[in-house]
UniProtKB/Swiss-Prot annotation:
Protein's name in the database: Acetylglutamate kinase
Record-marked site positions (Transition state stabilizer): K7, K216
InterPro entries, sorted: AceGlu_kinase-like_sf, AcgluKinase_fam, ArgB, Asp/Glu/Uridylate_kinase, NAGK-NC
GO biological process entries: arginine biosynthetic process via ornithine; L-arginine biosynthetic process
Gene Ontology terms: cellular component: cytoplasm
Annotated substrate binding sites: G43, G44, R65, N157
């Protein structure tokens, strides 16, 4: 069975209750299914807390974090360090053998600079599946941060949704984007069960889909097109539904290619 990539985001990394729910669901799923799992994560809340503590400004452009040269080391420490190791510690607590990685390990995801105005922000492209497939064959849970590196050795902060998409293309994996919200909402706050590119363009033009959700929807649409299959956006809040989600039952918004 092809792997499943679970991309974690939102305040999940900042909530012990949420992490307990997630890893309990992962344990239940792994006990009843042989499907290999990979976690990809960002950690915007961890970065924001650190930046605030250091009195550094947080600037975003089109939903992407601007990352100046003097901040990339801090952001790398927050994402590839604190956020990654927090997830590894929760895996350890739940007796899941895990390995912490960043996008550059094994050239799993290739990264180039996205836009000079954004600074150290990377564009992710599929890379080599060899390392992660080896880990999956050994029964490990790879936990991959959204920090990448260019061919020139420059560290880059990559949008985690886009990083997960590139890794899914690398591995031929299915993709779930877990976030704080139950899916994409319409103008009345109701969950939209299925989303096409045309529907997304309409909601963006109407101002219903805004800011970071535009990035998330575009990443999911890109993933669906790249992978040739649907991608799910769903919430981590309903732990009892997560095993069904991991098994292919939509509980949020299903993005169609």
């Amino acid at each position: 069975m092809n792997p499943l990539i679970i991309k974690l985001g939102g305040v999940l990394l900042d909530s012990e209750e949420a992490l307990e729910r997630l890893f309990s669901a992962l344990v239940d799923y792994r006990e009843s299914h042989q499907r290999p799992l990979v976690i990809v994560h960002g950690g915007g809340c961890v970065v924001d807390e650190l930046m605030k503590g250091l009195n550094l400004p947080v600037k975003k452009k089109n939903g992407l974090r601007v990352t100046p040269a003097d901040q990339i080391d801090i952001i790398t420490g927050a994402l590839a360090g604190t956020a990654n190791k927090t997830l590894l510690s929760w895996a350890k607590k739940h007796h899941i053998a895990s390995v912490g990685l960043y996008l550059g390990d094994g050239d799993s995801v290739k990264v180039t600079q996205l836009d000079e105005e954004l600074g150290h922000v990377g564009l992710a492209q599929p890379g080599s599946p060899k390392l992660i497939n080896t880990l999956l064959e050994g029964g490990f849970l790879p936990v991959v941060s959204s920090i990448g590196v260019t061919e020139e050795g420059q560290l880059m902060n990559v949008n985690a949704d886009q990083a997960a998409t590139a890794l899914a293309a690398t591995l031929g994996a299915d993709l779930i984007l877990l976030s704080d919200v139950s899916g994409i909402l319409d103008g009345k706050g109701q969950r939209i069960a299925e989303m096409t590119a045309a529907k997304a363009e309409q909601l963006i033009s109407q101002g219903i889909i805004t800011d970071g959700m535009i990035v998330k929807v575009n990443a999911a649409l890109d993933a669906a097109r790249t992978l040739g299959r649907p991608v799910d956006i769903a919430s981590w809040r309903h732990a009892e539904q997560l095993p069904a989600l991991f098994n292919g039952t939509p509980i949020g918004t299903r993005i169609l290619a």
